[in-house]
Amino acid sequence: MRIGLGYDVHRLVENRKLILGGVEIPYEKGLLGHSDADVLIHAIIDSLLGACALGDIGKHFPDTDSRFSGISSIILLEETGKLLLKSGYAINNIDATIIAQKPKMLPHIENMRKNISIALNIDINKINIKATTEEGLGFTGEMLGISSQSISSVESII
């Protein structure tokens, strides 16, 4: 068994959609980034790549590549899943946390889990997503951005 850790953060700005776990969440601001800036999916991708010693999201989907401009991070997650299988790994589980003062994430978590399950072609029971605040502290507490952390375990299937 191998374990990987992922982290991502993006700034909240006006005139952008807020996409987390492939779900569009109604909110007055969205996350700024080259792709759709889905911090949850980006953290999960990094944790999966890290568990397999395959680098990070920037290595496989660089923000200097126009092919990834505005792309749905769910597509990047699908590609990551294919890369893991090609490299001889299967996903045991994913546990992720979204850190945001607002909006409330609980109403959207099941749809996030479903999207991730479909993108990676794994059982939804292998995916856990939690949300927390920083009690008004730091950049997430001041509603300047949203961050996410993820830990994943994989096993060799070769």
Curated annotation (Swiss-Prot):
A Gene Ontology BP annotation from the UniProt entry: isopentenyl diphosphate biosynthetic process, methylerythritol 4-phosphate pathway
Residues that, per the record, bind 4-CDP-2-C-methyl-D-erythritol 2-phosphate: 8-10, 34-35, 56-58, 61-65, 100-106, 132-135, 139
Alphabetized SUPFAM superfamilies for the sequence: IpsF-like (SSF69765)
Segments passing through the bilayer: none
Catalysis: reaction(s): 4-CDP-2-C-methyl-D-erythritol 2-phosphate = 2-C-methyl-D-erythritol 2,4-cyclic diphosphate + CMP
UniProt EC number: 4.6.1.12
Cofactor: a divalent metal cation
Amino acids binding a divalent metal cation: D8, H10, H42
Positions bearing the site annotation: Transition state stabilizer: H34, T133
Leader sequence residues: none
Subunit structure: Homotrimer.
Record PANTHER family: 2-C-METHYL-D-ERYTHRITOL 2,4-CYCLODIPHOSPHATE SYNTHASE, CHLOROPLASTIC (PTHR43181:SF1)
Protein family membership: Belongs to the IspF family.
Free-text function comment from the UniProt entry: Involved in the biosynthesis of isopentenyl diphosphate (IPP) and dimethylallyl diphosphate (DMAPP), two major building blocks of isoprenoid compounds. Catalyzes the conversion of 4-diphosphocytidyl-2-C-methyl-D-erythritol 2-phosphate (CDP-ME2P) to 2-C-methyl-D-erythritol 2,4-cyclodiphosphate (ME-CPP) with a corresponding release of cytidine 5-monophosphate (CMP).
This protein's name: 2-C-methyl-D-erythritol 2,4-cyclodiphosphate synthase
Gene field: ispF
